[in-house]
Amino acid sequence: MSKRVVLTGATGLIGKKLARKLHERGDVPVIISRDPVQARGMAFVNEFVKWDYKDPKPVLKKLEGAHAFINLAGATVAERWSDPYKMVILNSRVQTTDALVHAISLLQEKPKVLISSSATGFYGNTGDNEVDETSPHGEGFLADVCVAWEQQAHLAEEHGVKVSIVRTGVVLSPEGGALKKMIPAFKFMVGGSLGAGTQWMSWIHIDDIVDLYLHLIDNPQDGVFNGVSPTPVTMDVFVFQLGRALKKPSLMKVPSFMLKLMFGEMASTILDSQKVIPAYTEKSGFHFKFPELDEAMEDLLKVYSV
């Protein structure tokens, strides 16, 4: 049976592919946007809701009867973190989530589940320690953002709605994110490790993170789900596999101090070590298509290896 699924952040890397997958399988993605002009470029979507996340009453009719709300909205963290921009990062997540929960509270027919994005930044810098969904939050700006973000989402439970939190790691796609930014350096033979190279990376193939959202839409449940593959790798291993998939060397190194000079505090997203395991994700019955990095790289970069 076709499901209506409301999405915020649908023009982002995950949102675009998720909306397309929903459409392809016969569901109805309903896109919420402050400015739906960009969203209307997604030919496979025909329901849009223009909303500034303030007064929800004018849009409630279009939100009634949705099976699930998917919250992917949030300003990119891949910018230099000035104090004003830190507030943008925080507010774009917490205020949007607050608005969604408020809208849900006013609906006559509430969704079965709110699936709200978070990040593995929740755990902070974990060094070589393995962490899973039961581990406590860490320290630092991103950890604080994730805590506030998740707390806001959990308020939907007060209205009888299940809440799934997806703590997403580094999403691999040649269409955006970290992988797209790293490919050019390798193509010009100057690719290599960032920082010490020993820091752990928790990654996930774009198809797997989209499938995880579909899994949670189809199986509404409370809980936290790490959106990462079961096989985290060190930065050195990551760039080696990237170079191998592109048939290019991975000999260069960018030292930590240079990254800090270039990006300031934001460099922590590259230099911090996170060895995150999707224990509860797998326990929920989700199966990864690409659990191993070499297989993921081969699939994602096959167009470059021809």
Task: Name each region found by the language model.
Residues 98-140:
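Conserved Rossmann-fold NAD(P)-dependent oxidoreductase catalytic core, especially the SDR/UDP-sugar
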Residues 218-265, 298, 304-306:
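Mid/C-terminal beta-alpha module of Rossmann-like enzyme folds, strongest
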Residues 5-25:
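N-terminal Rossmann NAD(P)H-binding glycine-rich loop of SDR-like oxidoreductase domains
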Residues 91, 95, 127-165:
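Catalytic helix-loop patch of NAD(P)-dependent Rossmann-fold dehydrogenases
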Residues 41, 46-96:
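NAD(P)H-binding glycine-rich loop region in Rossmannoid oxidoreductase-like domains
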Residues 183-191, 198-233:
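Alpha-helical substrate-binding/gating segment
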Residues 268-306:
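C-terminal amphipathic/interface module of NAD(P)-dependent oxidoreductases
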Residues 143, 147, 155-165, 169-200:
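NAD(P)-dependent short-chain dehydrogenase/reductase
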